[in-house]
Amino acid sequence: MARDFYEILGVSRSADAEELKRAYRRLARKYHPDVNKEPGAEEKFKEINRAYEVLSDPQARANYDRFGEAGVSGVGAAGFSDFGIGDMGGFADIFETFFGGFTTSSRRQQGPTRGEDLRYDLKLEFREAVFGGEKEIRINHLETCKTCQGTGAKPGTRPVTCSTCGGVGQVRRSARTPFGSFTQLTTCPTCGGSGVVIEDRCESCGGQGHIQVSKKLKITIPAGVDNGTRLRVSGEGDAGLRGGPPGDLYVYLFVQPDPEFQREGNNILSRIKISYLQAILGCRISVSTVDGEAELKIPAGTQPGTVLVLEGRGVPRVGNPVARGDHLITVDVEIPTHITHEERELLEKLAKIRGERLGKGGLEGFLGSLFGG
């Protein structure tokens, strides 16, 4: 399965445009083929470009968050010619790469923090993926503690300002580098970066501000989804911290193999067996489709391996269930290994009419000649 675009850039799903740009510049500078000659660097650079191209476009990003790569299949990848070292930031970017976390960086935010996103893998039957519907799942996620309202403090008390960092959440330390001495900001070891200390912890959540809850959810499956399609359920991830919004739940879909049907894009593939007489004379037979039984016309003289098409009986397009692919049916012709005496006589008469000599190949050779053998 393809890597997640957010993972490729090393950013969270809530990253804003500026965060995406910084991450992209840093990685693109590192793996640009003019700079990095290591094996695999060029492919890595293409992967980074593709991820940034999608995530930097608000509409493409929304489609990707909803449907994964299936939702952005039409977004083209940029080539190397569009990107040069000159476009990737100046000395400040290089400085940040080597000295991230020093005073040139912004101060750590101590306000509301968005909750973590969660992942759930959901298995679907073949027809469920074709037609969509609703599925009920159960998840475990963190919810804001109702006793302390997320503060982590015992009711009637409040967190107090951390005396180590003065509520900033960071402490300073000096460091010497080849470029001189710098002051580095690091996370406060006392409060863990929150800027506050809880003296009387909430008994319900143990001072965490959230508790784990098991919850049932109904997931709407769009028609036409495929293996690896990702659905986003807004607000069903873990609870945020300090009044921050919850994360999202990402449901990854995995379609189970079907004993009768296969999928190729939006087309459905299957095979049928017919007798040699049906192939010679033609007929109409009933075949299985995802919609139920359907009538299929077998033209006279149908050859083994012929592919017949039932139009509009395939997989719906995601987001446009009215538009469907086709059902492609491959015909296998069965040649009997045993026939009755009467059948043999009739076939031998037919062979004489056609001027066929039944030599070494016998009757089987004659039947093979009828089907292009």
From Swiss-Prot:
A zinc finger (CR-type) spans 132-214. Keywords: Chaperone, Cytoplasm, DNA replication, Metal-binding, Repeat, Stress response, Zinc, Zinc-finger. The keyword Secreted does not apply. PROSITE patterns: DNAJ_1, DNAJ_2, ZF_CR. CXXCXGXG motif repeats lie at residues 145-152, 162-169, 188-195, 202-209. Its main location: cytoplasm. The keyword Zinc-finger applies. This is Chaperone protein DnaJ. It comes from Thermosynechococcus vestitus (strain NIES-2133 / IAM M-273 / BP-1).
